[in-house]
């Protein structure tokens, strides 16, 4: 995705650090009935009630100068605004430059953009990796932080995003104990999300 080129990784590693961007991707797919039902179960009935706050490193913006992800992020956060209404974020066009990216759903592109902009720090001696721009994300519903969600709820957000937004018929999912540390009431929801996935 760097240097104007669209790139979808053949292998995508998603762990618990991705749950915020997974929730944002689901919010961007709020008009999909199954996703809307899931958001309602989280207490989200109107995405306009959600505020998303980004903590960013301004000095690193230049590293992403000619990138679709940064151009979209700059439109979402005009004039350095870092507190954004979720409806604004969900309705801001992604405007991808490549024809291949234009075929992707907005929610998938938003996940990929935020994934790229918020990846872990580059380690010493690792070439060709860009330092992250977004240090942290806080999502609030009427001033109540989603950071207080249980581990099981965060895992369910990840599974829902993987199965409803990121995956397709050609995807193979490898899950490492997805129900570990999950309340018994959430295990059924996890199983249903996995079983309804159309990939493998």
Where are these regions (language model features)?
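Extended helical coiled-coil dimerization/tether regions that scaffold
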Residues: 3-154, 160-172
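Conserved catalytic loops of ABC-family nucleotide-binding domains
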Residues: 168-169, 197-200
């Amino acid at each position: 995705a760097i240097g104007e080129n669209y790139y979808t990784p053949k292998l995508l590693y998603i762990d618990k650090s991705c749950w915020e961007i997974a929730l944002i991707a689901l919010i961007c797919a709020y008009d999909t009935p199954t996703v809307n039902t899931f958001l309602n179960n989280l207490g989200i009935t109107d995405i306009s009630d959600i505020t998303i706050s980004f903590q960013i490193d301004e000095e690193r913006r230049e590293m992403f100068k000619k990138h679709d992800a940064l151009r979209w992020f700059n439109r979402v956060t005009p004039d350095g605004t870092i507190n954004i209404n979720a409806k604004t974020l969900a309705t801001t066009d992604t405007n991808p430059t490549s024809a291949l990216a234009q075929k992707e759903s907005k929610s998938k592109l938003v996940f990929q953009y935020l994934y790229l902009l918020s990846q872990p720090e580059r380690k010493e001696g690792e070439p060709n990796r860009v330092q992250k721009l977004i240090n942290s994300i806080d999502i609030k519903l009427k001033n109540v932080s989603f950071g207080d969600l249980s581990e099981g709820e965060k895992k369910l957000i990840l599974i829902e995003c993987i199965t409803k937004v990121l995956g397709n018929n050609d995807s193979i999912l490898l899950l490492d104990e997805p129900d570990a540390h999950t309340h018994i009431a959430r295990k059924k929801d996890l199983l249903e999300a996995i079983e309804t996935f159309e990939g493998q």
